[in-house]
Curated annotation (Swiss-Prot):
Subcellular location field: Secreted; Cell membrane
Framework-3: annotated span: 74-109
This protein's name: Immunoglobulin lambda variable 2-23
A GO cellular component entry from the record: extracellular region
Residues that bear Pyrrolidone carboxylic acid: Q20
Biological processes annotated in GO: adaptive immune response; immune response
Record region (Complementarity-determining-1): 45-53
Species: Homo sapiens
UniProt function note: V region of the variable domain of immunoglobulin light chains that participates in the antigen recognition. Immunoglobulins, also known as antibodies, are membrane-bound or secreted glycoproteins produced by B lymphocytes. In the recognition phase of humoral immunity, the membrane-bound immunoglobulins serve as receptors which, upon binding of a specific antigen, trigger the clonal expansion and differentiation of B lymphocytes into immunoglobulins-secreting plasma cells.
Framework-1: annotated segments: 20-44
Ranges where the record places region Disordered: 73-92
Length: 113
């Protein structure tokens, strides 16, 4: 029986100094090894829709969050090109292609507001 990865997406935040709104992600996303999955992050025209400043973080249990994507689609040095970011309107997305066991983690998005 094929096993599935469970990619939890439980926490989102806006990072502006006066931000009150929250971004919306699915509670969980799952996929099988080798598949591609996309995690959405929906905001408003005041945050995600207005700025190309969405960041995505990966966090494994007991570890510090790791920056995976910044400014919507840029990857820091050392981050696999299996991770990609995009945006359409008020929704940003993180796509992970060729899922691997080590991709099982929490993924957080944040946006300037």
């Amino acid at each position: 029986m094929a096993w599935a990865l469970l990619l939890l997406t439980l926490l989102t935040q806006d990072t502006g100094s006066w931000a009150q709104s929250a971004l919306t992600q699915p509670a969980s996303v799952s996929g099988s090894p080798g598949q591609s999955i996309t995690i959405s992050c929906t905001g408003t025209s005041s945050d995600v829709g207005s700025y190309n400043l969405v960041s995505w973080y990966q966090q494994h249990p007991g570890k510090a969050p790791k920056l995976m994507i910044y400014e919507g689609s840029k990857r820091p040095s050392g981050v696999s090109n299996r991770f990609s970011g995009s945006k359409s309107g008020n929704t940003a997305s993180l796509t992970i292609s060729g899922l691997q066991a080590e991709d099982e983690a929490d993924y957080y998005c944040c946006s300037y507001a």
